[in-house]
């Protein structure tokens, strides 16, 4: 698993910060959280091929979160992208995608699967699930949660104790099935242990609300907006955003292990003030 922060600015990009986009690479899956203007260029700078993107999770349709979509899709079409690009977003996403294709001329179309999400699990396979929950920003908006499934791991010291050779027997134990070896029945719990799956939470463009805590609950990594410092809490509430202090409060209350702040107002040339706000709490 690898997470790349392609953009951390809010509505206005700066020389140092691109509009919002966060990329989660997990095995064959490449999950892009939001796609602000200039995202495809950030992929190039990060040395990540656009063809790695398999899913795009749109929080909402304010321009700074989606202006990179047309360019990214156009470039993928020129690269003979052979996969199916899944795009998830709040109610209205299908119509907005249709309008986008009406507005721009695409010489070639890629295989798209656009899905609208309300609340709950939006995708699940044997390795992980994706969840979405509504936030509060004055328009349809979602926060997202990546939940890796727990994994059964082999304890090699115990395997050696039972003299179990490499091969299908170990695979069977890893699949939580008992085996027969040297006349003995060996149960999975005797030679394996469970490794907890990782949880990644993504929250942006919202006032503090109950679902912030639901999304962030027990997260190994909470990625949370911090548009303003606590000095501008009034402005933050007026425009439907959170302060760095509030992000830290969410992390604390939700038992998150790590917090990464994103979505900074362009007024901040550096993030020191925002970091200090958060560190005083978390």
Question: Could you say what each language-model-derived stretch is?
Answer:
Residues 1-46, 82-84, 144-146, 192-203, ...:
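Conserved beta-strand hairpin/beta-sheet module of binuclear metal-dependent hydrolase folds
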Residues 6, 117-124:
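Local beta-strand/beta-hairpin segments that build beta-sheet-rich folds
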Residues 68-75, 100, 269-278:
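Metal-dependent catalytic neighborhoods of phosphoester/phosphodiester hydrolases
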Residues 119, 209-282:
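Binuclear metal-ion centers of metallo-dependent hydrolases, dominated by the metallo-beta-lactamase
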């Amino acid at each position: 698993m690898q997470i790349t922060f392609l953009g951390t600015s809010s509505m206005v990009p700066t020389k140092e910060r691109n509009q919002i986009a966060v990329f989660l690479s997990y095995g064959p899956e490449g999950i892009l959280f939001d796609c602000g203007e200039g995202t495809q260029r950030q992929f190039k700078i990060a040395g990540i091929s656009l063809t790695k993107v398999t899913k795009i999770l749109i929080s909402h349709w304010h321009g700074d979160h989606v202006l990179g979509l047309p360019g990214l899709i156009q470039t993928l079409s020129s690269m003979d992208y052979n996969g199916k690009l899944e795009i998830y977003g709040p109610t209205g996403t299908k119509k907005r995608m249709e309008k986008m294709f009406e507005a721009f001329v695409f010489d070639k179309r890629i295989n798209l699967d656009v899905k609208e999400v309300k609340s709950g699990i939006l995708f699940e396979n044997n390795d992980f699930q994706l969840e979405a929950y509504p936030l509060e920003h004055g328009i349809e908006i979602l926060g997202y949660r990546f939940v890796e499934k727990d994994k059964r791991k082999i304890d090699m010291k115990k395997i050696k104790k039972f003299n179990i050779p490499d091969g299908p027997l170990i695979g069977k134990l890893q699949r939580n099935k008992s085996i027969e070896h040297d006349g003995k029945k060996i149960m999975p719990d005797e030679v394996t242990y469970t490794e907890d799956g990782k949880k990644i939470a993504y929250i942006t463009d919202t006032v503090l609300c109950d679902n912030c805590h639901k999304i962030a609950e027990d997260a190994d990594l909470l990625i949370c907006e911090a548009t303003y410092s606590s000095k501008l809490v009034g402005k933050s509430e007026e425009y439907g955003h959170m302060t760095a202090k509030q992000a830290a409060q969410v992390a604390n209350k939700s038992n998150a292990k790590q917090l990464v702040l994103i979505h900074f107002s362009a007024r901040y040339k550096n993030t020191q003030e925002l970091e200090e706000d958060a560190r005083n709490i978390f």
